[in-house]
Amino acid sequence: MILIKNGRVMDPKSQRDQVADVLIDGKQIVKIASAIECQEAQVIDASGLIVAPGLVDIHVHFREPGQTHKEDIHTGALAAAAGGVTTVVMMANTNPVISDVETLQEVLASAAKEKIHIYTNASVTQAFNGKDVTDFKALLEAGAVSFSDDGIPLESSKVLKEAFDLANANQTFISLHEEDPQLNGVLGFNEGIAEEHFHFCGATGVAEYSMIARDVMIAYDRQAHVHIQHLSKAESVQVVAFAQQLGAKVTAEVSPQHFSTTEDLLLIAGTSAKMNPPLRTQRDRLAVIEGLKSGVITVIATDHAPHHKDEKTVDDMTKAPSGMTGLETSLSLGLTHLVEPGHLTLMSLLEKMTLNPALLYGFDAGYLAENGPADLVIFADKQERLITENFASKASNSPFIGNKLKGVVKYTIADGEVVYPN
């Protein structure tokens, strides 16, 4: 048993926000009240700290199988725990791609060994070929939670329509990476900074928002649910808002990096700040924040994309892979760039990092209640920390190294067990 004493208990589902004690027995919260006494329990003094549901991150790359020099499921789970994350959804762009039941079962067997809750998407198309839709029914029955070709945009409208119909038939949804290759230049560099400083055509805004426009309208026609991944453009927020007003089943996420900083960071942090979609302009950054405030964007998800140091340490930045390690900085970026400036309340931030992503997938997570799951994060919301290369992840490809950010995770509890510090 674990007894958490005197913390500020915050639950986005019930809107509870009060200093209280939380008693955990096994994998459940058994009591939330003031002044709980339990002699046999391990006591955690949470005075002055926030006690919240464990974070739910629905967009991570754990690189297993096939790319475990970057990350593996075990180190990914450690990184999640260090960041206060107790539930994750992995993407399917492994090697081999999670397109068949056999590969899916191998990945889930590895995930089951970890102490946090690890789910995975399967791919929409076979090995990301963009042509042949996978067996949704068989993959769902084998444990996939949804479908995404994340990392590779789905170019064929015909295939997308087929996938939406299949998703509907199986009561699921599709998540999409929106960057039309035919309208894009060099990935990872926003078009403005690409032209001005690097003198080539970069990743354009129209490549993102035009593809979103196509996809939300096909989803509208098919009455299918589409989830837009890591949108980054002001116009993308407007397109999603329009589709939602029309009655389309559209949800959207934003990554912390896109509400925290801009393309200029490429000139300072180099390849660590190269990602898809790229860091954009201040106008775009403020627009995605407005999307979070208005409720157009309901989910914050990291797109945790670890890479080996040697892969990122190259003379030609265009040759470096895109992506950044994100699980261990996401809460701090939210506190620093959303809560501290007054864009979101702490409760609203927690809602977008816990309850909303859990509801999207139907997970029993993202809330604190008696008889509910004992998945919690305990953190100091005002305390500053210096971001260093000392990550639990195998990777340290973060453009935020050297930054002072708000928020220090003190304890992460998953299934009633303290998993950080471990």
Swiss-Prot record:
Binds 2 Zn(2+) ions per subunit. It is an enzyme of class 3 (hydrolase). GO terms for cellular component: cytoplasm. One of its GO terms (molecular function) is dihydroorotase activity. Zn(2+) 2 binds at residues 150, 177, 230. One of its GO terms (biological process) is purine nucleobase catabolic process. The keyword Zinc applies. Pathway: Pyrimidine metabolism; UMP biosynthesis via de novo pathway; (S)-dihydroorotate from bicarbonate: step 3/3. Zn(2+) 1 binds at residues 59, 61, 150, 303. InterPro entries: Amidohydro-rel (IPR006680), DHOase (IPR004722), DHOase/Allantoinase_Hydrolase (IPR050138), Dihydroorotase_CS (IPR002195), Metal-dep_hydrolase_composite (IPR011059), Metal_Hydrolase (IPR032466). The active site is at 303. Catalyzes the reversible cyclization of carbamoyl aspartate to dihydroorotate. HAMAP family: PyrC_classI_B. This is Dihydroorotase.
